[in-house]
Amino acid sequence: MTSERSRIPCLSAAAAEGTGKKQQEGTAMATLHRKVPSPEAFLGKPWSSWIDAAKLHCSDNVDLEEAGKEGGKSREVMRLNKEDMHLFGHYPAHDDFYLVVCSACNQVVKPQVFQSHCGRKQDSKRNASISWSGAESRQALEQRQV
């Protein structure tokens, strides 16, 4: 069942009052104060087209992009070491996030570390096979000498 708001592409404060809907006292939603198109009307289109249609501006008529730059200075930022860049990627907040499963040990790892993970597994297998083949060759040599 869809609500009345989801079927109406735009809903302003006047439209809400015209339908008999009551606004809460002193706590009206920001979208009721100005006409904003519903994102559902822009399904399958880029967000930029919705932003252009909505003409979103801050209350002091500063664009949202500029406000974001100013507000970004006060945000807390966690810095990552350059040595860990192969683990987290260049821009972790913007990079796509994928996980892969190692078929040898069923461990879930990020693709960035999968090669080193397999390298460690291969190295441990090689060391085991080298020591086994070394012992086997010693036994073969001893049998030939007898």
Curated annotation (Swiss-Prot):
Q: Which domain of life is it from?
A: Eukaryota
- Give the residue ranges for region: Disordered: 1-27, 125-146
Return the Polar residues bias intervals. 127-138
Q: What is this protein called?
A: Ataxin-7-like protein 1
In which organism is this protein found?
Answer: Mus musculus
